[in-house]
Amino acid sequence: MAKKTKKTEEITKKFGDERWKALDDALKNIGKDFGKGAVMRLGERAEEKVQVMSSGSLALDIALGAGGYPKGRIIEIYGPESSGKTTVALHAVAQTQKEGGIAAFIDAEHALDPAYAAALGVNIDELLLSQPDSGEQGLEIACKLIDSGAVDLVVVDSVAALVPRAEIDGDIGDSHVGLQARMMSQAMRKLSASINKTKTIAIFINQLREKVGIMFGNPETTPGGRALKFYAYVALDVRGNTQIKGTGDKKDQNVGKETKIKVVKNKVAPPFKEAFVEIMYGEGISQTGELVKIASDIGIIQKAGAWFSYNGEKIGQGSENAKKYLADHPEIFAEIDHKVRVHYGLIELDEDDVVEDTQVEDTSDELILDLDSTIEIEE
């Protein structure tokens, strides 16, 4: 029988034990018919905090608030052409594989570059790739992969390229009003429960379109109807900003671009936070670059003039040399990355971190004692 609380005792006084007995019988019957856990008290759930997986970008993890993409949820990434949407998604694929998971990529645009994916850290030998003939086929493949429970991440690139079969079979110029929106709406209804149950992360990349005749307000919209907007737990707006000039022999060349990623929807943490990353051509997001900037902003890496220092040791003159130092010393990179994540509350404190704080306090006490003893001697 269910454990009684103060409120349940009051109900029992009013209506007797029959009401609780009827509820217990109903819960048992529901469990038999639909399986254990079909109905439960919210406090009985083992997991209260949403599990996350790193996005592969420290700046984006901080902007997301929880430290990465929530597991068992739908993510939408949209933005203008060549803004870095696929790059952001491929970093998530690389991170999934790095953590020992399995990732699948539904390439509806038929435009995935294996060499570029490999440069971003994706193990292309282990990546599951599908290039579907129609939108229904692509979504059905994604559904079967998610239902299997064996895949940790599914990326669909892109929603705009998921063309309904009726449109493919028809002639150019035929009207197919609402076909794609109905297809996406049906897919979201079918996928959402399965995604949550299997704790799979589903990333849908989307393009931008403009509404005709809009004089006021934002004319931009995304294809595929409103279903994805409703079902998405997190939505990211990716926009490329200024070009990054090279140094040395490449000083006249553009080697990358500064990109702004805005969290326009977030059900895990407060939305509308922004992450600024450097996407280097042929390399992806500069993880050393964002670490140098963030760590120096919060004082973990010290900056004096053009020099960057860590723990009293100079690591480079200028940001480029500091980035090179961190790339050549992965153990230092991991140590600084850990401290930054602890600072922003993305991960819990380790015992080592607590010990370090204790040591600092003890040292300060010793200094105070020494100062007092000195004063006594002078008197």
From Swiss-Prot:
CDD domains: RecA. GO terms for cellular component: cytosol. Keywords: ATP-binding, Cytoplasm, DNA damage, DNA recombination, DNA repair, DNA-binding, Nucleotide-binding, SOS response. ATP binds at G79, P80, E81, S82, S83, G84, K85, T86. Coiled coil: none annotated. It is found in: Cytoplasm. The keyword DNA repair applies. GO terms for molecular function: ATP binding; ATP hydrolysis activity; ATP-dependent DNA damage sensor activity; damaged DNA binding; single-stranded DNA binding. One of its GO terms (biological process) is DNA recombination. It comes from the Bacteria. SUPFAM superfamilies: P-loop containing nucleoside triphosphate hydrolases, RecA protein, C-terminal domain. InterPro entries: AAA+_ATPase (IPR003593), DNA_recomb/repair_RecA (IPR013765), P-loop_NTPase (IPR027417), RecA-like_C (IPR049261), RecA-like_N (IPR049428), RecA_ATP-bd (IPR020588), RecA_C_sf (IPR023400), RecA_monomer-monomer_interface (IPR020587). The keyword DNA-binding applies. Pfam families: RecA, RecA_C. Can catalyze the hydrolysis of ATP in the presence of single-stranded DNA, the ATP-dependent uptake of single-stranded DNA by duplex DNA, and the ATP-dependent hybridization of homologous single-stranded DNAs. It interacts with LexA causing its activation and leading to its autocatalytic cleavage. HAMAP family: RecA (MF_00268). Belongs to the RecA family. This is Protein RecA. It comes from Streptococcus thermophilus. The lineage of its organism: Bacteria, Bacillati, Bacillota, Bacilli, Lactobacillales.
